[in-house]
Amino acid sequence: MEKVYYFDNAATTFPKHENVYKAMDEANRDYAVNAGRGAYALARKASEVISETRQQIMELTETENVAEVVFTASATLACNEIFGGIDWEKKRTVYVSPFEHNAVMRSLFLYQKRYGFLITELALDEKGMELDQEKIRFQFMREKPDLVIMSHVSNVTGYILPIEEIAASAKEYEAIVVVDGAQALGLVPISLKNSPIDFYVFAGHKTLYGPFGIGGFIYHSKYRLKHMIAGGTGSDSLNLEMPEEGTVGYEPGSPNIVAIAGLHASLEERMTYLKENADYFLDREKEMTEYLIRQLKKIFGVTLYLPEHLENHAGIVSFNVEGYQAGEVGMILDQDYHVA
């Protein structure tokens, strides 16, 4: 296959580190058994890898002993499990940022049709590229928030949202706060230890540089969601009710040990750098992004869509070329220059 210059990292990061491929191959060949369903050595090994990967996520987000990590097949399923598990009966007003992915908006829309709550967008500044925190505080004063949902990083513009500040404002009204961190975790430092954020969603295959098939969410233990999916858990099997303690009740079915092993290897690799400098990857990405922006600005007919303050910007750049549809530009870059 011809060499490809891959830039589609907002969709999925590629290629992964060689250690990820090796770990997945090893898991597939050596211990791809059903974790938690047996006392034999291979099942224990699979369970250990799952437990260690949870611990890595907790270490990355500084949530040891204060939160739980739930694994799902993707960030999309994590959003669905959270929204499906919320008690909507008394929820009237939901605020979302204008930057939300359809993993949030379509799953939220399902419940809006059922329960009839109001969805309101968080206010933007005059240029329409960043949130206006003062306007948002007035929004909350006028219409009390019951739930606030935000992306940590926009998958379209690369804008890093002020999630902590807005979450703190929302907590003045006892709102539940959900953050979609699919484009952020592993790239943008985040501490959830004393955070006003209640649920933080992550995707294994994006900024964590793991494989497809593994995502999840981190939640503070004070919240118990209703169970949306039921099935086997490997424990208390005579009880037809789903377990209520810990994360097991949110993870029915056989865990994807091969994908989890890949995520485990990726986290191990990335945390080697992050322990020394929490901004290591973000700084490198910003340096490359600034170079890309400078070069694109030199091209006649290119329009860039950027936050005003580039310190609030991760490595995603949106642009148009005058006289071309975006799809046409993508096709030309692919066919003529092998740029994905």
Short names for language-model regions:
Residues M1-A340:
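Pyridoxal 5′-phosphate
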